[in-house]
Amino acid sequence: MDGRTPRPQDAPARRKPKAKAPLPPAETKYTDVSSAADSVESTAFIMEQKENMIDKDVELSVVLPGDIIKSTTVHGSKPMMDLLIFLCAQYHLNPSSYTIDLLSAEQNHIKFKPNTPIGMLEVEKVILKPKMLDKKKPTPIIPEKTVRVVINFKKTQKTIVRVSPHASLQELAPIICSKCEFDPLHTLLLKDYQSQEPLDLTKSLNDLGLRELYAMDVNRESCQISQNLDIMKEKENKGFFSFFQRSKKKRDQTASAPATPLVNKHRPTFTRSNTISKPYISNTLPSDAPKKRRAPLPPMPASQSVPQDLAHIQERPASCIVKSMSVDETDKSPCEAGRVRAGSLQLSSMSAGNSSLRRTKRKAPSPPSKIPPHQSDENSRVTALQPVDGVPPDSASEANSPEELSSPAGISSDYSLEEIDEKEELSEVPKVEAENISPKSQDIPFVSTDIINTLKNDPDSALGNGSGEFSQNSMEEKQETKSTDGQEPHSVVYDTSNGKKVVDSIRNLKSLGPNQENVVQNEIIVYPENTEDNMKNGVKKTEINVEGVAKNNNIDMEVERPSNSEAHETDTAISYKENHLAASSVPDQKLNQPSAEKTKDAAIQTTPSCNSFDGKHQDHNLSDSKVEECVQTSNNNISTQHSCLSSQDSVNTSREFRSQGTLIIHSEDPLTVKDPICAHGNDDLLPPVDRIDKNSTASYLKNYPLYRQDYNPKPKPSNEITREYIPKIGMTTYKIVPPKSLEISKDWQSETIEYKDDQDMHALGKKHTHENVKETAIQTEDSAISESPEEPLPNLKPKPNLRTEHQVPSSVSSPDDAMVSPLKPAPKMTRDTGTAPFAPNLEEINNILESKFKSRASNAQAKPSSFFLQMQKRVSGHYVTSAAAKSVHAAPNPAPKELTNKEAERDMLPSPEQTLSPLSKMPHSVPQPLVEKTDDDVIGQAPAEASPPPIAPKPVTIPASQVSTQNLKTLKTFGAPRPYSSSGPSPFALAVVKRSQSFSKERTESPSASALVQPPANTEEGKTHSVNKFVDIPQLGVSDKENNSAHNEQNSQIPTPTDGPSFTVMRQSSLTFQSSDPEQMRQSLLTAIRSGEAAAKLKRVTIPSNTISVNGRSRLSHSMSPDAQDGH
């Protein structure tokens, strides 16, 4: 015991820090007792008691929820939580729903922890108390099955209600009525509106098998109100519908005007044109432009009517004729513009809404949409109409042109004319032209419209002879358009002309209802005889008459228009020539563009297609003729110029112009044969075959020589690749001449330029003679060559030159014929004689040109690229047109003659360069005659002398560098981005040209023959023009050489009889094929005609444009490029 005690005492001391291991109870007892430690003893005692309590069972009374008392026994060691589970299980209760309350013997609540053993608590009663159920959410009610029921009411309204399908309709009625806002007392439930039998309200929806009801308010007032509301709604709907229809119509009309480049045929019906134009508008024109043009569209059906024209006078400037005339006779333009605008009325009307729009989008050939019917009738009806009324005929022609909405140039032309009218100043006109050039799309559409009308009027002519003539018309229209609008409208006209000679033909028919040729001659002579005002009318009328004369001479007619316009404008041969040169130069440049249309298509769509080239070329020739005629007869300067222009306007006219007395003969001759085309039609027809456009460009050289040269260097690859580019409808219609023509033109130009330099030095007569000889050989070949630009490559020097010379003779011959015609019909006959061996060839060429024209028109490959280029260079084309117009104004006044001389010299110098660029060649070639007259016309030094030759574009062609400089200036003036501004053809273009030449040999042989026929006359004219221009007449050889150098460079070396003609012919042939869009060619021609008046006024300011052309060949190319592209 003693031993134990000390141990326990020590132990507790030791274990206190731990305080966990109590001593054994016995020992503790003993220890506690012995030690008498109260704490230790008490603790030990409590623990012992607890242990004893835990070890034993405990009896409990359990109070269940229903105050049911149950007794149970549990082991004292069971924790309280376990006790709850145990009791709930014993009495089938949910432990989660109950809690345990403990009561002691004294009925006190005992607090416990869930893990406290029940034995340690002095528990007497356990109460199972349910937890607080109030906090719980009430159990969800099972949803009642419902269905969706559609309730129709008030005829047009419906609502949806969800109701029980088993409930009777009587129970559902209040719900339905409240939903429909009806009075349940006056509401009937029907199966549907038609059935008047009310439903049985005692049945449920399931019983009726319905899920849709009609609730009818039987109240009279509500019924009446509902009926009235329905009526009012119907009226409102109708009103809205009609309003939308109106607005839609307006939109469509507006859209149709700008978007009818290729929709010209659909133009007759607003719906068609609108629908077609809409996409175009959205793509090419701003929505505002269409809106503004909406108003003009209604007049478009009466596009021929003067009031409509007057209404659109300001817009009409795009149609160069009115404006150029207006420029000379400031206030004569309203009527004139009306006339001119008749063709491009819709175009101008569409552009009228927006001056800016007008500038940028003269394309809305709204009038053309309505003229398609005219186009078919124009051949017979318009011819009679236009000769009768100077204004109405032109209006008819232009209305026809607008009909052909597909030609955007028309719009631009209209705009140009309008602006020219407004400004009435040559300097102002160039600005307008620049503006118009920027709105190239508008200009082009208008020209295209004219061409389209011409094509429609004379589809056959457009194809063969018409191909060249169409080019002439295109040239004329482009001249007008370019005078006023720059070159854009011309290009469109060219395209349209290529596609359709109807417009010009219509004009011709109108002018020459009974006897197209004679009427043209007579009217042409009569109008030229009149004063400037009369000339204005004469130009328009003559243009129309010429149109009548030229189904085949559609181009001539258009040329006549510009020429007359120019003559009228300047009042003197020089002034007129300047204007004509401005117009002619523009077309010529455009013609050059088609030659290098690939190069210049974007920049100038002046010669969208070969017809456009022809138109320009013929225009150029006409210009030359008129200038020459004016040179010969200063007294008859204006009238003679006018008649010359009229004569030259049509292929016959060019012939007629050579000998005014012989005008009728020649007019008919060109119509029947390509011999007249040789003088003028030849220029135009062959230029289409042989890229007459270059000749036209030469003609334009005065105003737009740069275009031509630039056009030469600017044979665009696309043009070269696809020689048969057709202007797109929606686009500004920059028609890209098929690559073959362009390549051929390039090759021809390069070679022709070389030959031109060499052969240009040779007497033009030699060139003429050689051309006749070569034309004989080459026209056979060049028929194929014109057909396919490949031939020029093989015959690059002989045939391309021949073609070029052919083209130049076309260009020069036309002027020469014009000169000879005024001077003597014999020279014209000599020309023809020179080309006599080719007179049949001309017919062949006409046939070939027709076939080529068709093939080009059918050539869809060129179109895409052309369209793309058009889109690309649309603005530039507009600028080009404006620049052309400006150039026309500036060039004649400042120093056209000097420029012409410089150009001639430069032409001789850049011969190789121009040879490289067929465009330049053609322009040079064309400008030769025009240069001769460009001195007078552009320089205004020898108005009588130089006024006749419309081939004055030579100055532009002459200096390649000068032309480039001017081209740059022109481009700057135009503000048109020129995709291709190369002064020479690109290697690709050359390659294409070579390949095209190889193909063209076979295809364009007949066209080549035609071209050859033309070149002699052109050469003579070119000679005469050169003499007039440089040495008046003494230096015919030298001047001719210079002019021919430029002319040949532009017209692929007109001076070189042997090589030049071949080259020219090939180029012309290719040009003819390039103008595959007759409508656009037509419109280009119409635009040229329109711009003729504007050009006449612009001619005074033409020197700047000439300078641009001469100094900046590339610039001219730039300007031409858009038109060329436009044309193609």
Swiss-Prot record:
Basic and acidic residues composition bias: residue spans: 475-488, 899-908
In which residues does the motif KKRRAP 1 occur?
A: 291-296
The motif KKRRAP 2: which residues? 360-365
**Under the cellular component aspect of Gene Ontology, which terms does the record hold?**
extracellular exosome
Q: Where is the composition biased (Acidic residues)?
A: 416-425
Q: Where are the transmembrane segments?
A: none
Note whether Methyltransferase occurs among the keywords.
no
Q: What is the protein's given name?
A: Cordon-bleu protein-like 1
Give the species: Homo sapiens (Human)
